[in-house]
Amino acid sequence: EAMRQQPRWRNCEMRNRWLMQYKREEVRDMNLYGEILKKLEGTPCLALERSFVGEEGNLADMRCELKEGAEASEIGKEALTQGQPVCGRAGSSWNVAEPFFPKERLIILGGGHVALPVAEFGARVGFLVTVVDDRLSFANPGRFPMAEKVICDDFGHAIKELKIQESDYICIVTRGHRHDADCLRMIGKGKEPAYLGMIGSRRRVGIVKQELLEEGYDPERMSRLKSPIGLKIGGVTPEEIAISILAEIIQVKRMDREDKRVKNRSDLDFDVLKRLAEEPDESKAVVTVIESKGSSPRGAGAKMIVYRDGRILGSIGGGCSEAAVLGEARSLIGSGRYKVVHVDLTGEAAEDEGMVCGGIMDVLVEDFATDREPCDR
């Protein structure tokens, strides 16, 4: 009754205050990694920037900022450009920028014999696989059990609905050059994917390229088309051809440094990120490779969860490299602290373990503090 007797503006003011408080509590209930996953639904990349003094200390003293690409600092932008964590040091001060990207899609246009192993192997190496074909007998979940999506539709319409992003990897393996041209034509109207490859003989590929160039297709984009698709390994069977295709995709993702577009080259296991977001209350430590030199078993960005009861999820390389940090990780659980651990695989200890990697890693070990304040925006 008292509320109804108040001026209308007063009711609105109280309602707005309540909404603001609700939103603050909603963010507080979402841990850092939940916030990252949520933001990645609407942005192509994020940089988690940490700064701290000393190789070990309290998490409360660590500055943490989560920024979108355009808002990132110089070191954050460098991490996004390189596609993996970047570590800067000045005396005892550390600055670490860790990039995060949505899980990349592998879009397979065509559901024929080659598409089967490409979809399977693509899912196994961490892609979210989408298969498109205009024939129901070739585009159904039973045929592609490891695909996240199987779409039976006209190629042009399906491509339009998929809204191709710069983080996508696309294989054109249709049954004829007319469909190849339709796919290329539609893809050329939107954002350029990280990888675009097309199967076919040199003659078939040449016909399609010439046709589209005469229509006004961008010659520079056409020059980046991987066709004939795959690395030259002499593959004959569908499985061998699929291996050559995935090898080329991995090469573009990991090694194509001349391509200045932002790409995810981090060694992060996306399943680890999801687990961190989904189980905020269980005691654990988070282990992240922040710098890697030489032939270390895992690259920068590799992340592992260590539980108090001995369970682990993810890996930073196994063997002596992993054993060196497991004890440190368990000792930090519940402490509210962090520590940088240096792992040297060039010495006698590594040789005794049969490790011939010869690399060096800097690993950030953090207690997963459930009461830690959210990152600054």
Where are these regions (language model features)?
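Segments forming oxygen-rich coordination pockets for charged ligands
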Residues: E1, M14-D134, P141-F144, D168, ...
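Cationic, low-complexity basic patches in intrinsically disordered or flexible, solvent-exposed regions
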Residues: Q6-P7, Y22
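Short glycine/serine/threonine-rich phosphate/pyrophosphate-binding segments
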Residues: A115-V118, R178-C183, R204-I207, R298
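Helix N-cap at the beta1-alpha1 junction of Rossmann-like dinucleotide-binding domains, i.e.
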Residues: L136-F138, R203
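Conserved SAM-binding strand-loop segment of SAM-dependent methyltransferases
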Residues: E148-D154
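Short amphipathic alpha-helix with an adjacent loop that forms part of the alpha/beta core around
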Residues: G156-Q165
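ADP-ribose/adenylate-binding Rossmann-like module
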Residues: Y169-H177, R185-E211
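Adenosine-phosphate binding glycine-rich loop
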Residues: I199-D271
